[in-house]
């Protein structure tokens, strides 16, 4: 047990690989005495070949592989439960035992502050197969600040924001499941309100879409939101034109406002269709 705790502590002090983008990884590689092209080799192993163990990165020198293993945590999430359905859907319960770094929020909801995922807390992600598609349904927060009555995620309120790396790692872990060749689509429809964790979510989308990352086209990435007007307006200027889905789960505004939603939907819809013009 002591050895396990020691390894966990060591890993928590290492930089998380999925928090790197191409530029930051290149800077880290050069700073640590490796040639620039090592960046492309590492990215190819992780995103093209699905390899997260430096020991298997055979086109790197033995010294480089050892150094990477000692200084970079290629994965931080630990799967504590794995459920499968008869239709091929698979759900992972992932524990972020190493904790998370604070992430900034948009300020669109006053109750959302700078928060972090506490040690040992968990999020869910789901693989949804359909013919040739392999869709990753991922979480952006631990809990949710909105508190829609139809959704269990918000029962305990918001406990923390996930980092960009933790969001990206969910896609990687789902891609490691048996029989999954590659993830073709991503939907932000898991735990949390994505636009309330704007900086981390948009950073994650950049990696999901980038040619050096997962290379998933923008039209295959969907962000679902209850509708945060300030964040929606900002998101309209985001450089990657992903699909924005408004979460509508009631037939009229009275039910939405009074029974389900903490946010006034009429204002949201007006803002979406006229305020962004």
Where are the regions a protein language model picked out?
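Conserved Radical SAM active-site core
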Residues: 121-242, 252-253, 274-276
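Short hydrophobic targeting helices and cationic amphipathic motifs
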Residues: 3-6, 269
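Short glycine-enriched, charge-decorated loop/helix-capping segments at active-site entrances
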Residues: 155-157, 258-263
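Accessory RNA-recognition modules of RNA-modification enzymes
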Residues: 54, 179, 256-257
């Amino acid at each position: 047990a002591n050895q396990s705790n020691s390894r966990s502590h060591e890993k928590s002090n290492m930089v998380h690989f999925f928090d790197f983008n191409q530029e930051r990884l290149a800077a880290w590689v050069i700073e640590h005495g490796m040639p620039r092209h090592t960046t492309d080799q590492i990215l190819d192993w992780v995103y093209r070949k699905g390899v997260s163990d430096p020991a298997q990165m055979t086109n790197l020198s033995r010294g480089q592989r050892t150094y990477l293993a000692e200084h970079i945590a290629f994965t931080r999430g630990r799967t504590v439960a794995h459920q499968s359905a008869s239709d091929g859907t698979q759900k992972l319960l992932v524990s972020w035992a190493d904790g998370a770094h604070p992430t900034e929020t948009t300020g669109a909801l006053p109750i959302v502050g700078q928060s972090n995922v506490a040690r040992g807390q968990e999020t869910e992600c789901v693989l949804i197969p359909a013919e040739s598609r392999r869709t990753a349904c991922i979480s952006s927060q631990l809990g949710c600040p909105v508190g829609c009555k139809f959704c269990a995620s918000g029962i305990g309120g918001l406990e923390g924001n996930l980092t960009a790396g933790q969001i990206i790692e969910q896609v990687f872990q789902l891609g490691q499941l048996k029989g999954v060749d590659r993830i073709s689509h991503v939907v932000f429809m898991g735990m949390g309100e994505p636009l309330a964790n704007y900086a981390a979510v948009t950073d994650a989308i950049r990696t999901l879409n980038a040619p050096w990352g997962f290379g998933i086209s923008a039209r295959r990435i969907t962000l679902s939101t209850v509708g945060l007007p300030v964040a929606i307006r900002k998101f309209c200027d985001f450089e990657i034109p992903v699909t924005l889905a408004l979460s509508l789960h009631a037939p009229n505004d009275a039910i939405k406002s009074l029974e389900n939603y903490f946010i006034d939907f009429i204002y949201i819809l007006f803002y979406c269709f006229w305020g962004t013009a």
